[in-house]
Every structure is written in C-alpha cells, then in structure tokens.
C-alpha cells in the first residue's frame, strides 16, 4: 500500500467517537489533525490515545498566535502529550514562531481556506512565505479551496517545505486539484467524519489522491 497523503481533521467533541473514527480510517491516512473542539471536549490526553490506537503522526492544530512565552508554554505541554507537529500562525512574528519551533516540528499558516482569509491574511501571504523560507518549518498551510493560491505559494516556497491544504470536501475544495496544484498533503474533516461510512470515505479520497501523484 502506497504512503498516504491524506490527513484527517478530527473536529469532533466526543472521545469515543474520535477514537472509533480514527481507528477505522487509519489505513488510509498519513496523519490525524486535532483541533480545539476535540481537545476541549476530550482533554489533551486524546493526543496520546490517538497515537496509541493508530500509530499515526498527530498534528495539533492550535493555530498558536500569542507572545513567545505563551506560545512556548502551550507548545511544551502539547508536545509532551505526544503531538508530532503544531500549527502556528506566522502573522504574530518571527519570535513567536521560533518559540514553537524550538520545541518541535512546526507548520506555519500562510493562508487559510475560508472566504474571510482574503480580507487580512491573503494580502500578507508573500511576507508569510518569506518568513517560512527563512525559518524552514516542516510545512505551511495553504487553501485547497483556491488551487491557484496553492500553485502561487508552491512557486515561491523552498522545495523542502511541505504544503498542507485544508478545505477539501465540505468547503468545496477537491483533493486531486490540491495535489496537482502543488500540495504535499490534503486535510479533510467533515467529508470523512460526517460520512455514514468514514472508512469508505477515507478510502475514496486516498485513491483519488493516488491517481494524480
């Protein structure tokens, strides 16, 4: 079985449901992304439990956006819980991002997938790409809802920095389009965990991606 490029955004509250969905879809995933809903609903220990159940990397999508000391305090506990990667905002500046990177692998938001991102984030995307190129994080977040923006970001980003793209499915993006535009990984949430058959939904997306890589 070829390595997956699919990341499950497990945006649910309930611990048992989260573990059940993670276990049944794990064969088709590269990683699982946890966000505030699951951490608030189930506690930080859910990161440890998901790793135990699936053996997959865990991305903590906290979008850290605070002063360096606060970012450092949060990241320390999240990495201790077993997270492999943390997502942080770049717009708060180099020092705040470096505080997270000192502790573990970091993914920087350079552009988001929702319509409102065009108001304040997209106008500074070039600056955020420059920051990423200088700091060399594991990866950056770019919008699968706008493949042309993924292509734009890829063309200006150092090749060793991965692109992870949310917005596939419920937000309107297509997995294969994101990959063809230059994404390394595709992040999907509701189209998998909201499906009547999450495993089958994950399998279909896994195969869609494989057709274009």
Swiss-Prot record:
Belongs to the OMP decarboxylase family. Type 1 subfamily. It holds the Pfam family OMPdecase. This is Orotidine 5'-phosphate decarboxylase. Homodimer. The keyword Lyase applies. SUPFAM superfamilies: Ribulose-phoshate binding barrel (SSF51366). The lineage of its organism: Archaea, Methanobacteriati, Methanobacteriota, Thermococci, Thermococcales. It catalyses: orotidine 5'-phosphate + H(+) = UMP + CO2.
